From Swiss-Prot:
Helicase ATP-binding domain: residues covered: 35-422
Family: Belongs to the UvrB family.
Source organism superkingdom: Bacteria
Entry protein name: UvrABC system protein B
Molecular functions per Gene Ontology: ATP binding; ATP hydrolysis activity; DNA binding; excinuclease ABC activity
Gene name, Swiss-Prot/TrEMBL: uvrB
Motif Beta-hairpin mapped to chain: 101-124
Gene3D superfamilies: 6.10.140.240, P-loop containing nucleotide triphosphate hydrolases, UVR domain
Species in which this protein is naturally found: Bordetella pertussis (strain Tohama I / ATCC BAA-589 / NCTC 13251)
Origin organism lineage: Bacteria, Pseudomonadati, Pseudomonadota, Betaproteobacteria, Burkholderiales
Binding-site residues, ATP: G48, V49, T50, G51, S52, G53, K54, T55
Record function comment: The UvrABC repair system catalyzes the recognition and processing of DNA lesions. A damage recognition complex composed of 2 UvrA and 2 UvrB subunits scans DNA for abnormalities. Upon binding of the UvrA(2)B(2) complex to a putative damaged site, the DNA wraps around one UvrB monomer. DNA wrap is dependent on ATP binding by UvrB and probably causes local melting of the DNA helix, facilitating insertion of UvrB beta-hairpin between the DNA strands. Then UvrB probes one DNA strand for the presence of a lesion.
Subunit note: Forms a heterotetramer with UvrA during the search for lesions. Interacts with UvrC in an incision complex.
Gene Ontology CC entries for this record: cytoplasm; excinuclease repair complex
Length: 678
């Protein structure tokens, strides 16, 4: 086997880290898809089974073709997983993350039946906002960029032309006055704060201006002027003040995607006034005097804010005026920042394509009510996500990636490439059908067998009530079980999955487990209760996806509890058998012995999901601490303080990671018999 290392391709700016050479169906899939892109095919499908290394195939394609890429995932959890993997494959290149930056979002809405107006309320995740700004900066600055995102990328952000026009390029030796630098920074939506130096802030001390770029995770810029000339540019650590690097040139990007040049704002104010006059005349003619008065009051306040500050609360509702677009034209989105020759990958496309089509309709109905009752001008309807046909018109050369492609992919794909044989030699699980009338007792017996072997079990039911009852029943019979449902947020869901992998409990019960993008090599049994109840949760696609959750384990098995075999079951079983036969044949022909997947329980993404606290003695505690009693005591105190600090700052994921490291260290103390008193 070839040693791990970096691989470069001719005319490609990417440095691909290959932990292992492509194997199984990967080499053929990479060649076929790369050739398809080179031949100009617009749409291709990678039909890749669970655990076949689809992300690795994508990374190899990107590196070979040497083009910027956008990878879309159906949810934040999967996007974080893909982002972590892409960072491993491209540690020397720009791998960026673009998802919704709202931790909490209550959109502006009006309920006519109760005469209730709900103000927009939101909580923005600072870290994700920084990553979004970093993503657009990378797209504008460099070719070796991979962006991992969700459907958030079809929502309007600032016009790329305006955004690019507002950048501040600084070079040593350039003549520029202090007043001009400060005015430019304010126009770019940076705020002056000489006391609290954080992202999107600048501070001034005589001829020195410190700027903390909005897209920078940790370094700030120090600009020193002498007699209206830039004397030096230095990157420094805002925490310690230590200079890291002297620079001949630096580009400061705007503090927000919605930044707009002054002349554009002034032009927009005039067109907003014109639209307001027309709309007021229409409302008054219709006898809607309350609505007219409400609209005039709200819009005039926004116009005053735009005149004085250049922005206002809810500025996105005036995006059509600011971008100069015609009524009905789609808003600028992340897709507009992509170069024309970029690649697109739509992961789990059978889910993601449906999301792309559904976003527009829900947004439209809410906004129409706001416009009808005088809360917004009609132009607010153009601040919206793209419609599916608009997204299609902006798509670059695209690869749909799914184990179960839906009708859309089948209609559009010019080329379908199968990736069925796994690099590890693992084969699809054995599928059994057992009677439904004894399903709970039979399942209990199977769980005890798996738990004895330190293996995990996934159980999928049809209803929330049944999942709760089953969880109670299993718990009463001594099974360590948890229940995963839609009310659990993203972070807690990741923690539950992590605890399952670590053996904190043995059985996870859920209703629609397949949508979680579960990647759990420890799961050796998937049990599907009431598999013969035809419908969305028991369709062919759902069954194949759920069966695939056991495909990463050497002893993988799926049990379908049913009293009859439905058409969906038959097709799912036949497809699994077809893949299994192909995999076994490949292993036989090449003398491959299947080996299980051992995958570290790792952090997904800083600031999105907790850094791994498990295996914490290796990851969070220096090795020398483990051999020194005093150092261990100091480390425990440090971790306790860190945990409390994170909790005070409401950073619960990091607090949980510190707690895990603390527990691991205390366990080591107990095991080694070292006494310690706090």
């Amino acid at each position: 086997m070839t040693a791990p290392g970096f691989v470069e391709f001719p005319d490609s700016p990417f440095h691909l880290y290959q932990p292992y050479p492509p194997a199984g169906d990967q080499p053929g899939a990479i060649d076929a898809l790369t050739e398809g892109v080179s031949d100009g095919l617009m749409f291709q499908t990678l039909l890749g089974v669970t655990g076949s290394g689809k992300t690795y195939t994508m990374a190899n394609m990107i590196a070979r073709l040497g083009r910027p890429a956008l990878v879309l995932a159906p949810n934040k959890t999967l996007a974080a997983q893909l982002y972590a993997e892409m960072r491993e494959f491209f540690p020397r290149n720009a791998v960026e993350y673009f998802v919704s930056y709202y931790d909490y979002y209550q959109p502006e809405a009006y309920v006519p039946t109760r005469d209730l107006f709900i103000e927009k309320d939101s909580s923005i995740n600072e870290h994700i906002e920084q990553m979004r700004l970093s993503a657009t900066k990378s797209l504008l600055e460099r070719r070796d960029t991979v962006i991992v995102g969700t459907v958030s990328c079809i929502y309007g952000i600032g016009n790329p032309g305006d955004y690019h026009a507002m950048v501040l390029i600084l070079r040593t030796g350039d003549r520029i006055s202090r007043r001009e630098v400060l005015a430019r920074l304010v126009a770019m939506q940076y705020t002056r704060n000489d006391a609290d130096f954080t992202r999107g802030v600048f501070r001034v001390r005589c001829e020195t201006i410190d700027i903390f770029p909005a897209e920078s995770p940790e370094l700030a810029l120090r600009l020193t002027l002498f007699d209206d000339e830039i004397e030096s540019l230095e990157l420094f650590d805002p925490l310690t003040g230590r200079v890291r690097q002297k620079l001949p040139r630096f580009t400061v990007y705007p503090g927000s995607h919605y930044v707009t040049p002054r002349e554009t704002v002034l032009r927009a104010i005039e067109t907003i006034k014109e639209e307001l006059r027309e709309r007021l005349a229409q409302l008054i003619a219709d006898g809607k005097l309350v609505e007219a008065q409400r609209l005039e009051q709200r819009t005039r306040f926004d116009l005053e804010m735009l005149q004085e500050l250049g922005f206002c609360k809810g500025i996105e509702n005036y995006s059509r005026h600011l971008s100069g677009a015609a009524p009905g034209e789609p808003p600028p989105t992340l897709i507009d920042y992509l170069p024309a020759d970029a690649l697109m990958f739509i992961d789990e496309s059978h889910v993601t394509i449906g999301q792309l089509g559904g976003m527009y309709r829900g947004d439209r109905s809410r906004k129409e009510t706001l416009v009808q009752y005088g809360f917004r001008l009609p132009s607010a309807l153009d601040n919206r996500p793209l419609r599916l046909e608009e997204f299609e018109a902006r798509m670059r050369q695209c690869v749909f990636v799914s184990a179960t492609p839906a009708a859309y992919e089948q209609e559009h794909a010019d080329n379908v490439v199968e990736q069925v044989v796994r690099p590890t030699g693992l084969v699809d699980p054995i599928v059994e059908v057992r009677p439904a009338h004894t399903q709970v007792d039979d399942l209990l017996g199977e769980i005890h067998k798996r738990a004895a072997l330190q293996e995990r079990v996934l159980v999928t039911t049809l209803t929330k009530r049944m999942a709760e009852d089953l969880t109670d029943f299993l718990s009463e019979h001594g099974v360590r079980v948890r229940y995963l449902h839609s009310d659990i947020d993203t972070v807690e869901r990741v923690e539950i999955i992590r605890d399952l992998r670590l053996g904190v409990f043995d059985v996870l019960v859920g209703i629609n487990l397949l949508r979680e993008g579960l990647d759990i090599p420890e799961v050796s049994l998937v049990a599907i209760l009431d598999a013969d109840k035809e419908g969305f949760l028991r369709s062919e696609r759902s069954l194949i996806q759920t069966i695939g959750r056991a495909a990463r384990n050497l002893n993988g098995r799926a049990i379908l509890y049913a009293d009859r075999i439905t058409d969906s079951m038959r097709r799912a079983i036949d497809e699994t058998e077809r893949r299994r036969a192909k995999q076994i044949q490949h292993n036989t022909d090449h003398g491959i012995t299947a080996r299980g997947v051992s995958k570290a329980v790792r952090e997904l993404i800083d600031g999105v999901v907790a850094p791994a606290g498990h295996d914490a003695l290796e990851s969070a505690v220096p090795a020398e601490v483990l051999t020194d009693e005093k150092a261990m005591a100091r480390e425990i105190r440090r971790l306790e303080k860190l945990m409390m600090d994170h909790a005070r700052n409401l950073e619960f994921e990091q607090a949980a990671a510190a707690r895990d490291a603390l527990n691991a260290l205390k366990s080591r103390l107990l095991l080694d018999g070292v006494g310690w008193s706090g």
